[in-house]
UniProtKB/Swiss-Prot annotation:
This is Putative uncharacterized protein YDR340W. Keywords: Membrane, Transmembrane, Transmembrane helix. It is a single-pass membrane protein. The chain crosses the membrane at residues 28-45. It comes from the Eukaryota. It comes from Saccharomyces cerevisiae (strain ATCC 204508 / S288c). It is found in: Membrane. One of its GO terms (cellular component) is membrane.
Amino acid sequence: MPNCFSEEIAGIALTTRPLGLKHFEVKVFLVFYIITMVKIYIFLIRNKIMERSVGIKIHYRLSTNSYSINILSYTVLDYDISYEKLSSKLGEAEVQGLIM
């Protein structure tokens, strides 16, 4: 019986002022983050580890000068094998980033 659950898989919030990042640096980070996440989700869907209910939400708040990215609505069909498959295909660093 597969282990099924749904929740937010990953989320990140960036505030440019405290980090001292310029808008260009934040945009470069956002692009890198999204490419990594899309790569992970394509792998999950192709290997039938995850259903296709995935959403990426990017929000910029002008009042606080901050970005937030949330990966929403996922269901892992077999969590026990997903970490091993992910780490073998994507590499340990990307899997650690996904879990954190």
